[in-house]
Amino acid sequence: NDIINEFQSIDKYLSKSKKFIMVGCGSFPLTLFYIREKYSKLNIIGIDNSPEAIINAKMLIKKLMFSNIRFDIIDGINYDYSDIDTVFIANLVMPKTKVLKRIAMTCKSGTIILLRVPVMYGALLSEDVNYMELQSFDLVDEVIPSKDTDDILYKLLVLEKK
């Protein structure tokens, strides 16, 4: 499973985190469910600018009886990331550059940003971003989640706030 491969590669960053947020969690936040299973003590937040997505995600966690995930209807360009240790930006989040600028303005030094960016056919669906233009982040790692290079839609960049 691509998500499992991806998170095994970034485990060292998540294991140090106390507060995690996913920007663009969507209606079925499978990434958050995996993180919740692996990191039960982690304070987890999912945000999305779609009220319908958040309503659906809240109904789903209620059915699953998950207690340590909170969801908020808010755009990633308006969130205050000052108390967040790890930020995960979903592949379909747009505009990614504005979200990254907001993170750079509000997060503390050392915050880890897990940024999914499109490759190959993924660029048809999602926006790429040049994080280097912002000069606020160092590239720590690059993770290609799929072992099958014909099936790659995105890669994960691990950034750290300077």
Which residues make up each language-model segment?
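Conserved class I S-adenosyl-L-methionine
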Residues: 16-28
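Conserved SAM-binding loop of SAM-dependent methyltransferases across substrates and taxa
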Residues: 27-40
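Conserved SAM-binding motif I beta-strand of class I
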Residues: 43-48
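Conserved SAM/SAH-binding beta-strand->alpha-helix loop
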Residues: 50-52
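Conserved SAM-binding loop
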Residues: 57-58
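A short, conserved alpha-helix within the catalytic core of class I
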Residues: 94-106
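Conserved beta-strand signature within the Rossmann-like core of class I S-adenosyl-L-methionine
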Residues: 110-122
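Active-site capping/gating segments
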Residues: 121-162
